[in-house]
Design a protein with these regions (language model features):
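Basic, Lys/Arg- and aromatic-enriched nucleic-acid-binding interface segment
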Residues: 1-49, 57, 86, 94, ...
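The DNA-recognition helices of helix-turn-helix-type DNA-binding domains
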Residues: 53, 106, 160, 182, ...
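Proline-centered turn/helix-capping motifs that create local helix->coil transitions or kinks
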Residues: 56, 62-65, 69, 101-113
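Generic beta-structure capping elements
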Residues: 64-66, 94, 126, 157
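Short, basic (Lys/Arg/His-rich) helix/loop patches that form interaction surfaces
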Residues: 17-29, 39, 89, 105-121, ...
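Short functional hotspots where side chains directly engage DNA or cofactors
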Residues: 58-63, 153, 164, 176-194, ...
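C-terminal secondary-structure termini that scaffold catalytic or DNA-interacting sites
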Residues: 58, 71, 76-86, 93-95, ...
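DNA/chromatin major-groove-contacting recognition/catalytic segments
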Residues: 72-77, 168, 189, 193-212
Length: 212
């Protein structure tokens, strides 16, 4: 299977720094892109997220549905195709802090927002209405070009999330769980080249075993 275009650890840091320096006038764009990079969710899962799926207190994102588009059906929602795609993903502090600001942005437009969180999607335009499912991909491409980053697609952000976790020695079973893969074999097949070289550890272990 061919390798995917991803950000390296350093590139991801620089990309996040760029996002964090964007004006709060585009907080909706920043949040959507950071959600894909920092939780590994698919584009359809991003557009299916509602505020009732966000647990800021426990720093958990609940992935429960996809919001997709096709010529035959137009824009529609569906449950993930596998049970493992229904998952809870931990969120880092930086993302949680941004989501708190984002929630205030919604409250500015609707004083009854807290009572209607199941009605509001996270991937929205400035009017707080749901974005067309392909919009974030176009925004991402424009930002990368404007600020001199290589092109990494929405799915590439998901691959980046996975590769960064693996390179930081997060257990493959844990990575597979948060990616929503059916089992860790799928994760290994696609991302094995990101696993850190453990040759020295293997030699050290074998030397200990073979000592007399």
């Amino acid at each position: 299977m061919p390798e995917k275009e991803v950000f390296s650890f350093r590139e991801a840091q620089e990309f996040l720094e760029m996002l964090d320096n964007l004006s709060d006038d585009t907080i909706n764009q920043r949040i959507c892109i950071k959600l894909m990079l920092l939780t590994g969710i698919r584009n359809g899962e991003l557009h299916g997220l509602r505020w009732s799926d966000v647990d800021l207190k426990n720093r958990i994102l609940h992935v429960r549905r996809n919001r997709l588009v096709s010529r035959e059906f137009g824009i529609y929602e569906k449950c993930p195709k596998t049970k493992t795609s229904l998952r809870d993903i931990p969120m880092p502090d930086n993302l949680v802090d941004d989501l708190k600001k984002y929630k205030e942005w919604f409250r500015l437009a609707d004083e009854h927002f807290d009572e209607k969180q199941d009605e509001y999607y996270l991937a929205v335009g400035l009017d707080r209405q749901p974005l067309y499912p392909h919009t974030i991909a176009h925004i991402l491409t424009k930002l990368e070009a404007k600020y001199g980053f290589k092109h990494v697609s929405c799915h590439g952000l998901r691959h980046t999330y996975c590769s960064l976790l693996i390179s930081q020695n997060v257990p493959i079973q844990t990575v597979s769980k948060y990616m929503g893969h059916s089992d860790s074999t799928v994760t290994l097949e696609v991302y094995s080249h990101f696993i850190p070289d453990t040759q020295e550890k293997v030699v050290f272990a074998l030397n200990n075993i073979s000592k007399k």
